[in-house]
């Protein structure tokens, strides 16, 4: 249903071309818990100031306890904090809210909260 990449290889190959890389982890999210898949998890990588920031999207309903259509956005970029390319939380949140629905379905948000507690 998808392709699992070596996250370090992706960053080493294209990281110098961009400020951030988005990993669509719709069908994974569990790789950091399986030792043989650790290289596939962008969230486990040790990054330095020359690496790009990382965004990871996960479809919660595909592998965790969320309702259909629930997803999470993870951001890993402390290693570039202070650099001009760093995306502060406020900017990311404003962009998210710009594209979020004006008619949110609150049970979806509740499902994400429940999932986070599991």
Locations of regions flagged by a protein language model:
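Conserved PLP-enzyme active-site core in the AAT-like
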Residues: 1-118
């Amino acid at each position: 249903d998808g392709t699992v990449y070596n996250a370090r290889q992706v960053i080493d190959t294209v990281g110098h071309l961009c400020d951030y890389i988005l990993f669509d982890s719709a069908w994974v999210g569990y790789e950091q818990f399986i030792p043989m898949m650790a290289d596939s998890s962008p969230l486990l990588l040790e990054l330095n100031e020359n690496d790009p920031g990382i965004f990871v999207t996960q479809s919660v309903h595909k592998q965790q306890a969320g309702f259909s259509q629930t997803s999470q956005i993870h951001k890993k970029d402390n290693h570039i904090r202070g650099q001009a390319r760093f995306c502060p939380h406020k900017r990311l949140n404003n962009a998210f809210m710009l594209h979020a629905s004006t008619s949110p379905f609150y049970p979806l948000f509740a499902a994400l909260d429940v999932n986070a507690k599991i």
